[in-house]
Amino acid sequence: MTIGLGHYLAVGAILFTLGILGIFLNRKNIIVILMSVELILLAVNINLVAFSAFLGDIVGQVFALLVLTVAAAEAAIGLAVLVVYFRNRGSIAVEDVNLMKG
């Protein structure tokens, strides 16, 4: 049995669904929401690489590397902002962040 395009798309769909569920089911912790967004981006990357390999075109793989770079920068900046916010406020609950003005 060979691993085909359908298998990669199924894994990507499962990861994407888990990321969406993580966002909708846990709205209290910002770190979990950030990790869920990263999971969604990982699912998109898996689909890009799978379609790229299936079609024999390298553009999807290059775009996946670009998305991976942007996702890493987004995670680093997001975690840095959360650390600074936690040091100032003492909490990272979504309700507390919604009260932030200005």
Swiss-Prot record:
One GO MF term: NADH:ubiquinone reductase (non-electrogenic) activity
Its membrane topology: Multi-pass membrane protein
Name of the protein: NADH-quinone oxidoreductase subunit K
Bilayer-spanning residue ranges: 5-25, 30-50, 62-82
Localization: Cell inner membrane
Task performed by this protein: NDH-1 shuttles electrons from NADH, via FMN and iron-sulfur (Fe-S) centers, to quinones in the respiratory chain. The immediate electron acceptor for the enzyme in this species is believed to be ubiquinone. Couples the redox reaction to proton translocation (for every two electrons transferred, four hydrogen ions are translocated across the cytoplasmic membrane), and thus conserves the redox energy in a proton gradient.
One GO CC annotation: plasma membrane
Pfam family of the protein (one): Oxidored_q2
GO biological process: ATP synthesis coupled electron transport
Keyword Glycoprotein: no
EC number, UniProt record: 7.1.1.-
Superkingdom of the source species: Bacteria
Entries under InterPro entries matching the protein: NADH_UbQ_OxRdtase_chain4L/K (IPR001133), NUOK/Mnh_C1-like (IPR039428)
Catalytic reactions on record: a quinone + NADH + 5 H(+)(in) = a quinol + NAD(+) + 4 H(+)(out)
Top EC class of this enzyme: translocase
Keywords: Cell inner membrane, Cell membrane, Membrane, NAD, Quinone, Translocase, Transmembrane, Transmembrane helix, Transport, Ubiquinone
Family per similarity comment: Belongs to the complex I subunit 4L family.
UniProt subunit comment: NDH-1 is composed of 14 different subunits. Subunits NuoA, H, J, K, L, M, N constitute the membrane sector of the complex.
